From Swiss-Prot:
Component of the SCF(sconB) E3 ubiquitin ligase complex. It comes from Neosartorya fischeri (strain ATCC 1020 / DSM 3700 / CBS 544.65 / FGSC A1164 / JCM 1740 / NRRL 181 / WB 181) (Aspergillus fischerianus). GO terms for biological process: protein ubiquitination. Keywords: Repeat, Transcription, Transcription regulation, Ubl conjugation pathway, WD repeat. Residues 276-291 have a biased composition (Polar residues). Residues 1-66, 267-306 are annotated as: Disordered. This is Probable E3 ubiquitin ligase complex SCF subunit sconB. SMART domains: FBOX, WD40.
Length: 689
């Protein structure tokens, strides 16, 4: 036996062997490893001399591959057969050895592989087209090698792999590396439970989610599910996302709240088989209006009921079971898509403009809801418009002087005039229901919330009207016209802005002033409480590169009024900062307010501390009109310009021009805003399309 054969049988090649010798030994190693390797895996076996005892024994012949091949085939069969019979008895057990009872496969060989689909076992079919090109004897050898590896336990597999790779040359190792790079990739969303998959997907942004939906049908079912997109809507709609900085227009809060419990249930009971096919464009779904669509649950009787998704209006009888929490709704992904489109239009100023003309004098107040717009003018009339068509629906006449303020809801419209009166109208019919006379001067500001109406007047007072018990009260403290009032029924407080350059916060229970805000050096025209969802971080005050607005450091903090039993030094919580009346669980007033004045500035205040957090500079003349939500502030001024501001950074994002007179009033919605001017026109900017 020569040195090369000894090296092959021992499984150790010489370090000085040529590539040709390595490749020659490679073919032999592929067919059957050395005896020592077999002994290490399958235990001691008979020698070649014990097997071949006939006259054609190879003891006197050279140990070439051709003479060794029949010997190795018999040796492989004798050594491999018991191993395969032990691990795969249903395929390799001798005939007659089975008793008719099904033989269970070893649990070690029946485990599912985490890398492949859970319904497929680790063993895979051979590459049949490639195998057909080989000789039958080679096919048998390769099949034996695959069978051994497939039947081997995990620790044996590692040992076999180590032995194979130890005999591989660099081209083969390179092939292994390239192949493993693809095989090592796992479909983790398929392997994981749905609730964990949803948790992972909720960390992705919208771009990554859309890419994930293109991987496979199952990934699309998971990535497009309402569980993921409802979370995305909660994170971005009506607020600024802290991660990406994006904020989308307002969606009906009630819909988000009603859907949250359903979404949580669906995440725990999700089944890909329940996901419907892609909805046709003409399927009957409840569309989303400009302010967002609503969801009304048809059944909510059991807290532990299973949730089943139903996107179309055709509900089969079996799906009307009370055990299911059913809703018909528009998918949250489509809702997010529409809101994202509107948000992008806001960001880049893409909008359509509709102009409403009809008043004969300057427009002083306006409000719009859905497709209804109401405007009040110095011509002593109120006009109702259809915002979709631009048509004037009706004109409300009754006041004897200019209309300075108005507000409407589904049932009524209340207006205030310089004729010292307030009127309640049925705006759908144009009928004047009642007239209230309580001020000694013109009514220039009003606001109602629930059953409380507040009005501000030229007579320097704020009057509170209670619709429920028909009571009224007068709040005195301002020394000049009261231009604007805002009621917060939850905390039972009222804000008022006056020409005396101050803003006051009133307690409706004690009929007293809680706090006065000082800082403006011009007549304060508007005060707007920000929604409670608005969040303002301290580091936002110290924003760098703020070329438009600066923090007001020279204005004094708001001064709390003298309240018996109230110590400002010991009041460190937001509730106690407003006095002892707010210590018993009573809701606090809105945390932030914005004000505008004829000093050409807008200010953002923290009500609990009275600090002016930011002053917005940009208008050239006095700011008459102001509106705000959680995403933006809109202002109109004597300089005929309308500006859009970011309340967190103070940056002026965009300026709109077009009016030929001072901008006196503004209405703000999630996808549009309207401005009124002394030029007798109303301009509505829509970002929906």
């Amino acid at each position: 036996m020569d040195a090369h054969e000894l090296s092959f049988r021992d499984g150790h090649g010489s370090s000085t062997s040529t590539m040709k010798d390595e490749c020659a030994s490679e073919e032999k190693a592929l067919y059957l490893p050395g005896d020592s390797s077999f002994a290490s895996v399958f235990g001691p076996s008979e020698t070649v001399e014990d097997v071949e005892t006939g006259p054609e024994s190879t003891q006197d012949k050279p140990h070439s591959f051709n003479t060794q091949k029949p010997i190795r085939e018999k040796l492989a069969g004798k050594n491999v057969a018991p191993f395969l019979a032990r691990h795969i008895p249903e395929q390799y057990a001798p005939l007659g050895s089975q008793t008719g009872q099904p033989v269970e496969i070893s649990s070690a060989n029946s485990k599912y592989c985490y890398r492949h689909r859970p319904d497929l076992k680790c063993r895979r079919q051979a590459d049949e087209p490639t195998m057909d090109k080989l000789q039958r004897s080679d096919q048998q050898g390769i099949a034996h090698a695959w069978s051994i590896f497939s039947a081997a336990p995990a620790k044996h597999r590692k040992l076999i792999l180590q032995g194979i790779m130890a005999q591989c040359c660099f081209p083969q190792l390179s092939f292994i590396s390239a192949t493993v790079r693809d095989l090592i990739r796992i479909d983790f969303l398929t392997a994981l439970p749905p609730e964990i998959s949803f948790k992972i997907l909720c960390y992705l942004d919208t771009t990554s989610l859309c890419k994930a939906a293109q991987v496979s049908r199952r990934w699309r079912a998971l990535a497009d599910d309402d569980v993921v997109w409802h979370r995305m809507c909660e994170q971005h709609i009506h607020r600024k996302c802290k991660k990406c900085g994006w904020g989308l227009p307002l969606l009906d809060r009630k819909r988000l709240r009603e859907s949250k419990r359903e979404i949580e249930r669906r995440a725990a009971t999700w089944d890909v088989s329940e996901q419907p096919a892609e909805t046709e464009s003409n399927s009957a779904t409840i569309d989303t209006a400009a302010s967002g669509s609503k969801r009304k649950p048809e059944s909510d009787k059991e807290d532990t009921a299973m949730v089943k998704r139903q996107c179309t209006s055709i509900v089969s009888q079996s799906e009307q079971n009370e055990d299911y929490f059913k809703t018909r709704y528009r998918p949250w992904k489509e809702v997010y898509k529409d809101r994202f489109k509107v948000g992008t239009n806001w960001k880049y100023g893409r909008c359509s403009i509709r102009v409403f003309k009809g008043h004969s004098n300057g427009i002083m107040c306006l409000q719009f809801e859905d497709n209804i717009l109401a405007t009040g003018s110095y011509d002593a009339t109120i006009k109702i418009w259809d915002t979709e068509t631009g048509e004037e629906l009706r004109t409300l006449k009754g006041h004897r002087s200019g209309i300075r303020c108005l507000q409407f809801d589904d049932t009524k419209l209340i207006s205030g005039s310089m004729d010292h009166t307030l009127k309640v109208w049925n705006w759908r019919t144009g009928e004047c229901i009642s007239t209230y006379s309580g001020h000694r001067g013109g009514v220039v500001g009003l606001h109602f919330d629930a059953t409380i109406l507040a009005s501000g007047s030229v007579d320097k007072t704020v009057k509170i009207w209670n619709f429920e018990d028909k009571s009224t009260c007068l709040l005195r403290g301002h020394t000049d016209w009261v231009n604007a009032v805002r009621v917060d029924s939850a905390s039972r407080t009222v804000f008022s802005a006056s020409d005396d350059c101050t803003v006051k916060l009133w307690d409706l229970d004690t009929k007293s002033c809680i706090r006065t805000f000082h800082g403006h050096v011009g007549q304060v025209q508007q005060v707007v409480p920000l929604p409670r969802e608005f969040e303002f971080e301290d580091h936002d005050v110290e924003c760098e590169n703020d070329n438009v607005s600066v923090t007001s450091g020279d204005s004094p903090a708001a001064s709390p009024q003298a309240i018996p039993g109230f110590d400002a030094q010991t009041s460190d919580t937001p509730s106690s900062a407003f006095g002892p009346a707010f210590d018993d669980g009573r809701p606090s007033p809105p945390r932030y307010i914005v004000t505008s004045a004829l000093d050409s500035t807008i200010r953002l205040w923290e009500t609990s501390s009275g600090r002016c957090l930011r002053t917005f500079f940009g208008h050239l003349e006095g700011v008459w009109a102001l509106a705000a939500d959680t995403l933006r502030i809109v202002s109109g001024a004597e300089d005929r310009m309308v500006k859009i501001w970011d309340p967190r950074t103070g940056k002026c994002e965009r300026t709109f021009t077009g009016h030929s007179g001072p901008v006196t009033c503004i209405g703000l919605g999630d996808s549009r805003f309207a401005t009124g001017s002394e030029d007798c026109e109303v301009r509505m900017y829509s970002f929906q399309t």
